């Protein structure tokens, strides 16, 4: 199967229904995640989306020669180098790719927070924006843990009610 054939099938994901009845899309590939966001924007379904991405960042896979079994045990939230590279990846690539996917390159993510504990580091990014006369809030949560290089991303958009 060539790369073109793989791309033509659409994003690979699984759909989970949470206890509260919410439909949640889960991705394991960054490209599939971005493709899905772009599709939702084109379908005008962009203001009420909740999806999660669980993946190894590209810099980790590059160091391991694209073999997840060769990823070093030190690639986790206890490594200053890993945390620094992950933060750069998130700020310069992941958020930029999300902005491009939802067709909002001017999005700035002004609401930034970082929480550190012994077993994980969490970055939260948020911004209110408007697209096609619909106002909504974009929230991105990025989590890295102490037990591995796998990164969890929680992407959520919620419509903002107009003030009456």
From Swiss-Prot:
InterPro entries: RGI1, RGI1_sf. Pfam families: RGI1. GO terms for cellular component: cytoplasm. GO terms for biological process: energy reserve metabolic process. It is found in: Cytoplasm. Transmembrane segments: none annotated. Gene3D superfamilies: Respiratory growth induced protein 1. Belongs to the RGI1 family. This is Respiratory growth induced protein 2. It comes from Saccharomyces cerevisiae (strain RM11-1a).
């Amino acid at each position: 199967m060539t790369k073109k054939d793989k791309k033509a099938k659409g994003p690979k994901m699984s759909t989970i229904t949470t206890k509260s009845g919410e439909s949640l899309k889960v991705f394991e590939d960054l490209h599939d995640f971005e493709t899905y966001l772009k599709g939702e924007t084109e379908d005008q379904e962009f203001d009420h989306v909740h999806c999660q991405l669980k993946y190894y960042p590209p810099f980790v896979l590059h160091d391991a020669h694209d073999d997840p079994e060769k990823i070093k045990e030190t690639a986790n939230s206890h490594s200053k180098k890993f945390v620094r590279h992950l933060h750069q990846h998130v700020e310069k690539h992941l958020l930029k790719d999300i902005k491009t996917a939802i067709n909002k390159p001017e999005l700035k993510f002004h609401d930034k927070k970082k929480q550190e504990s012994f077993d994980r580091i969490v970055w939260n990014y948020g911004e209110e924006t408007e697209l096609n006369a619909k106002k909504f809030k974009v929230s991105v949560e990025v989590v890295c843990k102490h037990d591995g290089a796998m990164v969890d991303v929680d992407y959520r958009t919620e419509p903002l009610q107009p003030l009456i």
